[in-house]
Curated annotation (Swiss-Prot):
Protein name per UniProt: Guanylate-binding protein 6
Catalyzed reactions per annotation: GTP + H2O = GDP + phosphate + H(+)
Entry-linked Pfam families: GBP, GBP_C
Nucleotide-binding recorded as keyword: yes
Binding locations of GTP: 45-52, 67-69, 97-101
Length: 633
């Protein structure tokens, strides 16, 4: 779905059947095909409050998510609708509509809490939908937010400093939007007009008092303010006062609805399309459709096993799958590019190695782009090994191509020579001189042939070796030569053969040196790109930590200004810990990166430093090539 999904209607993503949550595999298959980044908008709220209408409007449809026209809740579980994003190219908008909270027909109310928590975990923009006003009752109905500390974990194990795990929610929680339907009040505070956002923030202020009822009432307010740093509010008038139209609102054209409601709905939709963020995990990991599917499966499996969905565990699960795919993607890219760019046989080994270096550099960049949380660079090492093996295949293919091409040319050039030998044309007085002149012409013509490849000398050397016995026979039978002249000719032939063997050995040593230099270059390129990635990840981590600190400080200062000194003081330990984390990230980056790079260098050197392994592969391969393509001479 690179060009964007074409879902004509929503599909259930998480089924809620008999108090059991199940992931719908058909929905996962749809997400698997979406490799684009996703903007995920989820809506939750009490049943029969018009959530589905808003989501249909975001999808640009009158109908889709079931609206229902009775007091029964229509939506069960979490439903999904993937549509091309209207304003972000190459992004998919994923709309999640959840079953109504507080439905008396449902059995275990715990499922409401899980649906709420899953929506928070899966989306990048979280919409809470309620009716009439944000008052004490509305906030009490939002008690699900207070349960998130029991239903979601950031880390798989408790923090050693004892600071609550929920302090890190702010680093990965979605933006929060409260939509208030059928709003009839005036937006005023103490006689002065206020904005919708100011209305929400005023409603979220804590109430003074220490009795249990006040504390219970304050808890949802406190959780929203602490967990969701970016908050927004939209109010909506009643769509129409006509009960018949309301009962069939999915069939009603917008023109039949209240103009003010239309305007408010359009403003809301425009905000979502413009400001709803791409879904990301901690440290800036971008979520695509297929990654979203993996997250959904991981979280629901955790719920069904009796565990608490944990972001850290989910990211590890996701990384295992994604990094394996990144290895394959990068290796495939390398193979495709080499196949496209290399014309076999290459004139020199260096030409092939330069092409390899360019394709490998691009493939490493692809691996880096699509991998994350590669603990101990396990997958990078797999990628390196895979690329090294593929490079070996290309080297062998290059050698084989060179052998075939050179043999074909030599067959062609030596055809006359072989026919003359068979006809006994050189078995005459002066035949040796004639034979040598013919052979020298073949050699001159052979070296004039362009792009013979890396085995040109070796193939010709084999040709010369095949002629040794023939030349000896012609020489000894040539009655025009004296014994001394024959002896001189034999010595000259041996000397020339030794020189050519020396040239061949020199070429092999040079190629071995080129291969070792190429391996060293490959190692340095891998380390350079890893270093850049580690530095970027550290910068992203630092930004997240600073954001968490600044948000926590803002909440703390708000408590103080609102007269809650005890709450202000309770947050000191939290803030101190954030500052320590930031100091560690700032000051310990160089040793940490250096240690990682040194370790990788050692391990990759072990992988790559098989010059004998790779070069031996080449040398061994040559003898097998000659067996495979036997010389006719």
């Amino acid at each position: 779905m690179e060009s964007g999904p074409k879902m004509l209607a929503p599909i259930c993503l998480v089924e809620n059947n008999n108090e059991q949550l199940l992931v719908n595999q058909q929905a996962i298959q749809i997400l698997e095909k979406i490799s684009q980044p996703v903007v995920v908008v989820a809506i939750v709220g009490l049943y029969r409050t018009g959530k589905s209408y808003l989501m249909n409007h975001l999808a640009g449809q009158n109908h889709g998510f079931p609206l229902g026209s009775t007091v029964q809740s229509e939506t069960k579980g979490i439903w999904m609708w993937c549509v091309p994003h209207p304003s972000k190219p190459n992004h998919t908008l994923v709309l999640l509509d959840t079953e109504g909270l507080g439905d008396v027909e449902k059995g275990d109310p715990k499922n409401d809490s899980w649906i709420f928590a899953l929506a928070v975990l899966l989306c990048s923009t979280f919409i809470y939908n309620s009716m009439s006003t944000i008052n004490h009752q509305a906030l009490e109905q939002l008690h699900y937010v207070t349960e998130l500390t029991e239903l979601i974990k950031a880390k798989s194990s408790p923090r050693p400093d004892g600071v609550d795990d929920s302090t890190e929610f702010v680093s990965f929680f979605p933006d929060f939007i409260w939509t208030v339907r059928d709003f009839t009040l005036e937006l005023k505070l103490n006689g002065h007009p206020i904005t919708e956002d100011e209305y929400l923030e005023n409603a979220l202020k804590l109430i003074q008092g220490n009795n249990p009822r006040v504390q219970t009432s304050n808890l949802p307010r406190e959780c929203i303010r602490r967990f969701f740093p970016k908050r927004k509010c939209f109010i909506f008038d009643r769509p129409t006062n006509d009960k018949d139209l309301l009962a069939n609102i999915e069939k009603v054209s917008e023109k039949q609805l209240d103009p003010k409601f239309q305007e408010q709905t359009n403003i809301f939709s425009s905000y979502i399309f413009t400001h709803a963020r791409t879904k990301t995990l901690r440290e800036g990991i971008i979520v695509t459709g297929n990654r979203l599917g993996t997250l959904a499966v991981t979280y629901v499996e955790a719920v069904n096993s009796g565990a608490v969905p944990c972001l850290e565990n989910a990211v590890i699960t996701l990384a295992q799958r994604e990094n394996s795919a990144a290895v394959q993607r990068a290796a495939d890219y390398y193979s495709q590019q080499m196949a496209q760019r290399v014309k076999f046989p290459t004139d020199t080994l260096q030409e092939l190695l330069d092409m390899h270096a360019a394709c490998e550099r691009e493939a490493i960049a692809i691996f880096m782009e699509h991998s994350f949380k590669d603990e101990n660079q396990e997958f990078q090492k797999k990628f390196m090994e895979t690329t090294m093996n593929k490079k070996g295949d290309f080297l062998l293919q290059n050698e084989e191509s060179s052998v075939q091409y050179c043999q074909a040319k030599l067959n062609e050039l030596s055809k006359g020579l072989m026919e003359s030998i068979s006809a006994g044309s050189f078995s005459v007085p002066g035949g040796h001189k004639l034979y040598m002149e013919t052979k020298e012409r073949i050699e001159q013509d052979y070296w004039q042939v362009p792009r013979k490849g890396v085995k040109a000398k070796e193939v010709f050397q084999r040709f010369l070796e095949s002629q040794v016995v023939i030349e000896e026979s012609i020489l000894q039978s040539d009655k025009a030569l004296t014994d001394r002249e024959k002896a001189v000719a034999v010595d000259r032939a041996k000397k020339e053969a030794a020189e050519k063997e020396q040239e061949l050995l020199k070429q092999k040593l040079q190629e071995q040196q080129q291969q070792m230099e190429a391996q060293d270059k490959s190692l340095k390129e891998n380390i350079a790109q890893l270093k850049q990635k580690l530095q970027m990840e550290r910068e992203q981590l630092l930004r997240e930590q600073i954001m968490m600190l600044e948000h926590t400080q803002k909440v703390q200062n708000d408590w103080l200004h609102e007269g809650f000194k005890k709450k202000y003081e309770e947050m000191n330990a939290e803030i101190s810990q954030f500052k320590r984390m930031i100091d560690i990230t700032k000051n310990d980056d160089t040793p940490w990166i250096a240690r990682t790079l040194d370790k990788l260098a050692d391990e990759l050197t072990a992988v790559l430093s098989a010059p004998a392994k790779l070069i031996g592969h080449g040398v061994k391969g040559v003898s097998s090539l000659f067996k495979k393509h036997k010389l006719p001479f």
